[in-house]
Amino acid sequence: MICIPVIDKDVSDAINSAKEALKYGDIVEFRIDLLNDVNFKDIEEFSKIPSIITIRAEWEGGAWRKSNEERIELLKNAIKNNAKFIDIELKEEKNLELVKYRNEIGSTTKIIVSYHDFEKTPEIDELIDVVEKELKIGDIAKFATFAHSKEDTLKILNLMNRYSGKIIAIGMGESGKLTRILGLDFGSILTFASMGGKASAPGQVDVKKLKEILKLIN
């Protein structure tokens, strides 16, 4: 799957961007933390669209500055409305609470548990530990680390291959672009691509360019 981040600040703009993005990608990621304002009704509307609902905490590189209680309740609302995916951080103490809630109400939402390092790509043993912890909590493990070298890129591709079909792995930055291009072939369930110059992380490839490259290599 190709996932296109939606990073608008207005709810109606985000809905329109998502509809346009789905002409090129398979799914969108709604970055709820970047919106000026959001309520339960908005989450219900977002959940109708094939998407990942992400409300990234400020302490994990996001922009959510309101209470964590409100953040968790909004994510529960996404689960209640059977959003395709939600994303919750590995470091979030209430991640298991969301999984328990999903199971109790019989929601079809898949839970992505994520980890970010915006400075470096840790050693492979540390990344394995992260992925194992994430898979004990949710359905899909995700990590995004900053790649500084070919060695970092190879580490990330190695992990994709090892956990094929249950991982999303990303190398941020110029050196990590190869992870975005080859990710699907190495076992990542999706790769992120930007549209119209709107990227949510460094190194995202434009969706049209990515599709051209994927067509050439496949």
UniProtKB/Swiss-Prot annotation:
The gene from which this protein is expressed is aroD
The role this protein plays is: Involved in the third step of the chorismate pathway, which leads to the biosynthesis of aromatic amino acids. Catalyzes the cis-dehydration of 3-dehydroquinate (DHQ) and introduces the first double bond of the aromatic ring to yield 3-dehydroshikimate.
What the entry lists under CDD domains is as follows: DHQase_I
The entry lists its GO molecular-function terms as: 3-dehydroquinate dehydratase activity
Record bears the keyword Lyase: yes
Biochemical pathway: Metabolic intermediate biosynthesis; chorismate biosynthesis; chorismate from D-erythrose 4-phosphate and phosphoenolpyruvate: step 3/7
One Gene Ontology biological process: amino acid biosynthetic process
Which principal EC class is assigned to this enzyme?
lyase
Tell me the Gene3D superfamilies matching this sequence. Answer: Aldolase class I
Keyword field: Amino-acid biosynthesis, Aromatic amino acid biosynthesis, Lyase, Schiff base
Complex formation: Homodimer.
Q: Which InterPro entries match?
A: 3-dehydroquinate_DH_AS, Aldolase_TIM, DHquinase_I, Type-I_3-dehydroquinase
Q: Which named protein is this? A: 3-dehydroquinate dehydratase
Residues where 3-dehydroquinate binds: E29, F30, R31, R56, R180, S200, Q204
E.C. numbers: 4.2.1.10
Residues of the active site: H116, K142
